[in-house]
Curated annotation (Swiss-Prot):
Disulfide bonds: none annotated. This is Dihydrolipoyllysine-residue acetyltransferase component of pyruvate dehydrogenase complex, mitochondrial. The active site is at H480, D484. Residues 221-258 form the Peripheral subunit-binding (PSBD) domain. One of its GO terms (biological process) is pyruvate decarboxylation to acetyl-CoA. The keyword Transit peptide applies. GO terms for cellular component: mitochondrial matrix; pyruvate dehydrogenase complex. One of its GO terms (molecular function) is dihydrolipoyllysine-residue acetyltransferase activity. The gene is dlat-1. Residues 168-223, 248-270 are annotated as: Disordered. The lineage of its organism: Eukaryota, Metazoa, Ecdysozoa, Nematoda, Chromadorea. The modification N6-lipoyllysine is found at K118.
Length: 507
């Protein structure tokens, strides 16, 4: 039974998995012998279109069904590849297998848990059968999309035939980078014995030779994919013996590559130094990559405003009192953050430039306001979305954000719940130690609002000479390509008015 008890939902007539196995498409699994009906194919096409519309900057999605047949003495079988469980996923880590070799599988069973660039999600069994062979073991990191995960067969009697099965590199219907293709082997000399007939979807068999050292010229021969991985991870290929044709370095050879500037032998830490090296999760790598790209490619500028909260706090107290009476104290209390989300959405309706996407060759103004709310989790930052926040009441926003934040910390969010927002709110004021800060824009969005903490301030008063008020500083980060300075100032003026005069949110 799945360990993610999330209610099933229907999208475009298809049943997405409880654990997001299909919601972000590009699934590299094979189809069972049951033929797809015209209606099912149409539904699949509809789902792909819906996902593409929701994630305009994501790579093209596809749901591929490929039947892979037997080779040699192996019976017919299905190859299940690592799927893309989020639009931005490139690599994955197999956290755990929920089934073991020989287990019977029913369509929809939780097959394994995969750590993506966003969260740890479950991958459901694509079809009925028996798990004949697991190719990627638990704990395997940075597995590329399309890499062969496991083998499924229709009959239990066929499981034993795959005991010694190894991945031959044949296509498994995924979308892994096409970089590790070995060159076509030379045509063998004529032989008196006829060669066996080629099998459908069977890759040519290339004898695996012992690693060949590099030539004395110093030139390193490596596949494009291996070079890409080495560059991203700072690995030195000069001392690696390749196992590919002619000594070419493949991605599988990188485990022996030392970091650039490091020696191949393990060195002891200098006496007196005490530290722990923490491996990077896929989520942390993605956060680092995306925020670095955002800060280095988006022309940020910042607008700060101080907002008086006294009237809002009075309205909040009255509304929470009414909610408590009407629901016997069961309703979620409205927080200042809920007012902020609502006011942000309404201000985006007044100033649509702030609710737009930068699409490189054009600007897309979104007609709905989906507010992403930054939530800190043990694994890193994630941004669940309040969809159509401009059209929702404060009580609805309050209950949704509490539920989404809880599931975010438990790692139970599905991709469509945290990808595709149009505006982001990041609130560090609740920690009580932050007066103001600036936040980094989440592309392709144009703005992010940073919320500081509330503090007391003395201001002049005609009656008593001075009075104490409660204020809060907010800073709007804007993309100057889509939001000019004056436009950002107008947005901030509307936002300030909504919070200082909360009744205007009802107009």
């Amino acid at each position: 039974m799945s360990k993610f008890p999330v209610p099933l939902r229907t999208i475009g007539g298809l049943r997405p998995s409880t654990t997001a196995a299909i919601s972000a498409a590009n699934i590299g699994f094979t189809q069972s012998s049951r033929a797809l009906s015209t209606g099912a194919a149409a539904k699949s096409s509809g789902l792909v279109g819906q996902v593409a519309r929701q994630y305009p900057n994501a790579a093209a999605f596809s749901i591929k069904q490929v039947r892979l047949y037997s080779s040699g003495n192996l019976p017919k079988h299905n190859r299940v590849a690592l799927p893309a469980l989020s639009p931005t996923m490139e690599l994955g880590t197999v956290v755990s297998w929920q089934k073991k070799e020989g287990d019977q599988l029913s369509e929809g069973d939780l097959l394994c848990e995969i750590e993506t660039d966003k969260a740890t999600m479950g991958f459901e069994t694509p079809e009925e059968g028996y798990l004949a062979k697991i190719l990627i073991q638990e704990g395997s990191k940075d597995v590329p999309i399309g890499k062969l995960l496991c083998i499924i067969v229709d009959n239990e009697a066929d499981v034993a035939a795959f005991k010694d099965f190894k991945d031959d590199g044949a296509s498994s219907g995924g979308s892994a980078p096409a970089a590790e293709k070995a060159p076509e082997p030379a045509k063998p000399a004529a032989s008196s014995q006829p060669s066996p007939p080629a099998q459908m979807y069977q890759a040519p068999s290339v004898p695996k030779s012992a690693p060949i050292p590099h030539s004395s010229s110093g030139r390193v021969s490596a596949s494009p994919f291996a070079k890409k991985l080495a560059a991203e991870n700072g690995l030195d290929l000069s001392g690696v013996s390749g196992s590919g044709p002619g000594g070419r370095i493949l991605a599988s050879d990188l485990s022996q590559a030392p970091a650039k500037g490091a020696t191949s032998t393990t060195t002891q830490a200098v006496s007196g130094q005490d530290y722990t090296d923490i491996p990077l999760s896929n989520m942390r790598k993605t956060i680092a990559k995306r925020l670095t790209e955002s800060k280095s490619t988006i022309p940020h500028y910042y607008l700060t405003s101080e907002i008086q909260l006294d009237t809002l706090l009075q309205v909040r107290e009255k509304l929470n009192g009414l909610l408590a009476k009407g629901t016997s104290g069961q309703a979620t209390k409205i927080s200042i953050n809920d007012f902020i989300i609502k006011a942000s959405a309404l201000a985006c309706q007044r100033v649509p430039e702030a609710n737009s996407y930068w699409m490189d060759s054009f600007i897309r103004e979104n007609h709905h306001v989906d507010v992403s709310v930054a939530v800190s989790t043990p694994a890193g930052l994630i941004t669940p979305i309040i969809f159509n926040a401009h059209a929702k009441g404060l009580a609805t926003i309050a209950s949704e954000i509490v539920e989404l934040a809880q599931r975010a910390r438990e790692g139970k969010l599905q991709p469509h719940e945290f990808q595709g927002g149009t505006f982001t709110v990041s609130n560090l004021g609740m920690f009580g130690s932050v007066s103001d800060f600036t936040a980094i824009i989440n592309p392709p969005q144009s703005c992010i609002l940073a919320i500081g903490g509330a503090s007391d301030k003395l201001v002049p008063d005609e009656a008593e000479g001075y009075k104490k008020i409660k204020t809060m500083k907010v800073t709007l980060s804007c993309d100057h390509r889509t939001v000019d300075g004056a436009v950002g100032a107008v947005w901030l003026r509307h936002f300030k008015e909504f919070l200082e005069k909360p009744h205007t949110m009802l107009l």
